[in-house]
Amino acid sequence: MFLKSEGYGAWNGVGTKANSPGDADVLILGIPFDGGAGGQRGAAFAPGRVRSMTGRLKSTSRRGDDLSSIRILDIGDVDVSTFDAMKTFDAIECSCSAVLDGTDSTLVSIGGDHSVTHPILKAVAKRGRTGVIWFDAHPDLLDTYHGFSFSHGSALRRAIETT
């Protein structure tokens, strides 16, 4: 795997810390990368910022559901290469594949601009049939953006081709 850390464990009392990816209901993976963004940067900061806010989370949902029995494992961040998007995409796909291998866990990725969608979906699709539900102000269906096929502007197009 290409992870920067050994992980962060459970999320401040929300859920129960799983011992391994195979024990987890939910796997959390940070992707601190915004090298595919064409405009304002900042998605690379999302994993750390989201984790810093988990202290505000409660173990009961707004509907009253008890979430404390959900087994969560935060496995850390993908080790990204700020100046080499293709190397980063390989690391994302390899990390996602490795942590999902042999599990029924749900992967939740945090951070990254839209360009990280393609390598995540490639890894998830190895498990079987995969679908995508896309919410965005625009469809991100460009074939290329400034000559790059894996930009934020082509994420949904690559997802359609992958799934």
Predicted feature residues:
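Conserved alpha-helical scaffold segments that buttress catalytic/binding sites
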Residues: 2-163
